[in-house]
UniProtKB/Swiss-Prot annotation:
Subunit structure: NDH-1 is composed of 14 different subunits. Subunits NuoB, C, D, E, F, and G constitute the peripheral sector of the complex.
Organism from which the protein derives: Maricaulis maris (strain MCS10)
Function according to Swiss-Prot or TrEMBL: NDH-1 shuttles electrons from NADH, via FMN and iron-sulfur (Fe-S) centers, to quinones in the respiratory chain. Couples the redox reaction to proton translocation (for every two electrons transferred, four hydrogen ions are translocated across the cytoplasmic membrane), and thus conserves the redox energy in a proton gradient.
Binding site for [4Fe-4S] cluster: 67-68, 132, 162
Pfam families on file: Oxidored_q6
UniProt protein name: NADH-quinone oxidoreductase subunit B
């Protein structure tokens, strides 16, 4: 018999977290499943449907500025595989919902960060990853460092650490999805 981590036909080559079942962690999905089993069709508010779809299909754009970007890349690798949460990378800001600012933001780079943020479609979200992006970090007193990317763009989730682990970034992504579900409106 295969263990929880042994790949089998249903896994399509992906590693899973033992004991994690996405169906158990999404109350909207539970309601949809119950309604389908009971009546054969679902009646739901369009706002709830859009919010549910939005949390399961977030496209992220990297803004890797320093060593935190290495941990951000690791979160996309097979061990953590953030795409299983519907969090897929995109290279263009016009196709992205989330920007991950990872690393030290300098005064010279700040206008480029704002320009890329302005090119993202609404609703857009920002994850600040690492001590340098959160508040300047080790280089806080340098003349050329912005003391937190929240001075340039509005930040939704802060991921602490120097550098934060890939697990911390995955937790931040899950918190962003929870925040989007809590807001629950089409307009942000």
């Amino acid at each position: 018999m295969a263990s929880d981590l042994t790949p089998h036909a249903g896994m399509a080559g992906r590693a899973t977290v033992p004991g994690y079942d996405p169906k158990k962690h999404d109350p909207f999905f539970d309601g949809v499943s119950d309604a389908l089993a009971d009546k054969g069709f679902v009646v739901a508010a369009a706002d709830d449907l859009v919010t549910w779809a939005r949390t399961g299909s977030l496209m992220w754009m990297t803004f890797g500025l320093a060593c935190c970007a290495v941990e951000m890349m690791q979160a996309s690798m097979p061990r953590y595989d953030v795409e299983r949460f519907g969090f897929a990378p995109r290279a263009s800001p016009r196709q992205s919902d989330v920007m991950i600012v990872a690393g030290t933001l300098t005064n010279k780079m700040a206008p480029a960060l704002r320009k890329v943020y302005d090119q993202m479609p609404e609703p857009r979200y920002v994850i600040s990853m690492g001590s340098c992006a959160n508040g300047g970090g080790y280089y806080h007193y340098s003349y050329s460092v912005v003391r937190g990317c929240d001075r340039i763009v509005p930040v939704d989730i802060y991921v602490p650490g120097c550098p934060p682990t890939a697990e911390a970034l995955v937790y931040g992504i899950l918190q962003l999805q929870k925040k989007i579900r809590r807001e629950g409106s089409i307009e942000r």
